[in-house]
C-alpha cells in the first residue's frame, strides 16, 4: 500500500469530521461532540502534512514540465532544476514524517495528567529527592507553557516530599511525560552524611491521563465520602468547619484524601478528579495485564516498579536505562531542561514502532 492509499482516507475522514462538528445534533450531544473534536485534533497534523506533501508532488511535476519546455533557455532550465532538487528533498522528508504520523496514536497523548511522586527506599534522602523531581517537573512545565497545580502534598520533618499529587494541564502533556512512570534512583552524598559516602535512594513517579466524567463514569454507590476537619503541622485542626474530604472507591479500595482547599466542595471536586483517574488507570492496567503481548511498552517493560533512570550527583550524570542514554547534564536536567531526554524517548518509541510495522 503506497502512502496515498493510506493517507487519502485520513483526509476524507477529516473533512467529514468538519461537517459533523457543525451539525446541531452532534453539538447538542456533549459526549459525541468531545469524541469527534478529539478525533479531528488527532488527525489535523497528519492531514496538514499530507496536503503539503501533495503540493510538493505537484511542484516536482511542474518543475519536470518546465525543464521539458525550457527550449534552450538556460536560465529557466537551471531554475527549474534547482526547484526539482529542492522538491525531491522535501518529498523524502515529508514521507519520513508521514510514516511517523501514520503510526497508531496513543488516544491519551493530548490529555492533561495527574502526576504522583513518592519518596520510596532511602528515608529522608528519598523524600528530599522526590522534592527535587517535583521541582524538575514544575520547571519543565514552565518551559512548555503548561499549568502545574499541586493538588495534595505531604512533607516530612526535613522538608522532603513523602507524597505529592499534581495536575499538569496544557498541550500534549501526556505524550511527553508518559515515559516518566517508574522508579527514579539517586546516588549522592546526603547532607547528613559526615563520612562523605555516596548513598542510593529511590523515588517513584506515576503519570496518569486525566479522565473526564463523560469518558469514565463512576457509579456513585461505589463511592464513600467522609468529611473531617483539615489538620495542619503537628496534627492540630486548622478549620472550625469540616472541609477535608476522604473518598474511597469501595470495589477497588482506592482512597484519596484532599484538604488543600478551603471549602468542602472544592476538596470534593479535586478528590473526584484524582480518584476517577486512579480507578480508570487501575482497570486499564488489569486489561493490559490480560493482553501481555500488547501491554509491554516499547520503552521499557511497562512495569511501574521498573528502575527507569539513575541520577548520579558526583558525576553529574543521568542515565535512562530503558534506551541506554547517558548525559553528563544532571544539573541542567534537574533545572527543568528535559527536552533532550524526552525527545530521545519519543524517538526511540517511534523507531521501535516503525520497525515492528515493517516486519
Curated annotation (Swiss-Prot):
Organism (species): Streptococcus agalactiae
Gene Ontology CC entries for this record: cytoplasm
Subcellular location: Cytoplasm
HAMAP family for the chain: Rel_fac_1
Modified residues (N5-methylglutamine): 236
PTM: Methylated by PrmC. Methylation increases the termination efficiency of RF1.
Chief location: cytoplasm
Family statement drawn from the similarity comment of this UniProt entry: Belongs to the prokaryotic/mitochondrial release factor family.
NCBIfam families: prfA, PRK00591.1
Keywords, comma-separated and alphabetical: Cytoplasm, Methylation, Protein biosynthesis
Molecular function terms, GO-annotated: translation release factor activity, codon specific
Pfam family, one: PCRF
SUPFAM superfamilies membership: Release factor
Function: Peptide chain release factor 1 directs the termination of translation in response to the peptide chain termination codons UAG and UAA.
InterPro entries named among the record's database cross-references: PCRF, Pep_chain_release_fac_I, Pep_chain_release_fac_I_sf, Prokaryotic/Mito_RF, RF-1
Name of the gene: prfA
Keyword Methyltransferase: no
Name this polypeptide is given: Peptide chain release factor 1
Superkingdom of origin: Bacteria
